Amino acid sequence: MKSVSLKLGVAAIALAGIAASSAAFADDESSIGTFSATASVASDYRFRGISQNDKEATPEFGINWAGNKGFYGGVWAAKTNWGGNTPSYETDVFFGKHTDLYGTDLNIEAYYYSYPDAKSAATSSYYETIVQLSHAFGPLTLTATGANSPEWSLKGGVAWYGAGTAAWAVNDWLTISGNVGHQWVDKAPKEYTHADIGATAVWKSFSLDLRYMGTDIKGADCSGFWMATKKACSGGFVATVNYNIAKLF
């Protein structure tokens, strides 16, 4: 479950990066693409507003591949703590494609969330298809996200997700962004809404994201979302420091 904080913070420059990468690869169709990496430390790991690590600090690592014609993929890992089911870490694999639709970026992604050491690893892990549309209006980038899982974690049944994101590039190093999303899970005690707002500052290969995240889930219902301890759904500030290696090879 990739942390959304940094993704939101850099949303305003993402389309420009995609366009530049596509142009570079168009000049060399034989290229196998490029590999990059990220390493982060976050004060909490939140996925769609819910803490995945019992509101404790967590390291996060990722390796990304950017290929020809908008194709991309990668792996991502982070420390987790769900309480009773206690997986100690999460390892995700994803693959997708960006397509330019007259200035609007269409991103279709297949995403697999894996929890290898969970007590019920086979049913904890699950798959999601994610579709995003992003468009830049000068310094403002708007993104709409939709996702579906045919079988949510721990046999939660069919799940749907929708979200809207706005990111404003104040200058070349500071972005202010916010996100509102809604999650439906068939066998969860209720559907819920989450939101966050914050800012991302970039300096060379480093970035700092400061963000407030919260949900409308009451404490008594929080543990019903399986991937959470009872206090994981309450709001809080999250700080993330990220280091990006632009090109491994």
Labelled PLM ranges:
Residues 1-34, 246-249:
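Cleavable N-terminal export/targeting peptides
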Residues 27-81, 95:
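Short glycine/proline- and aromatic-enriched beta-strand/turn motifs that initiate or cap beta-hairpins
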Residues 33, 55-59, 87-91, 104, ...:
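Residues that define the transmembrane beta-barrel architecture of outer-membrane proteins
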Residues 35, 69-75, 102-108, 138-144, ...:
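Repeated loop/turn-to-beta-strand initiation elements of outer-membrane beta-barrel proteins
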Residues 39-43, 61-67, 93-97, 110, ...:
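Residues on the lipid-exposed face of transmembrane beta-strands in outer-membrane beta-barrel proteins
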Residues 41-47, 77-81, 99, 112-116, ...:
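Transmembrane beta-strands of outer-membrane beta-barrel pores
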Residues 122-187, 212:
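Detector for outer-membrane/organellar transmembrane beta-barrel domains
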Residues 197-207, 212, 231-249:
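Outer-membrane beta-barrel "beta-signal"
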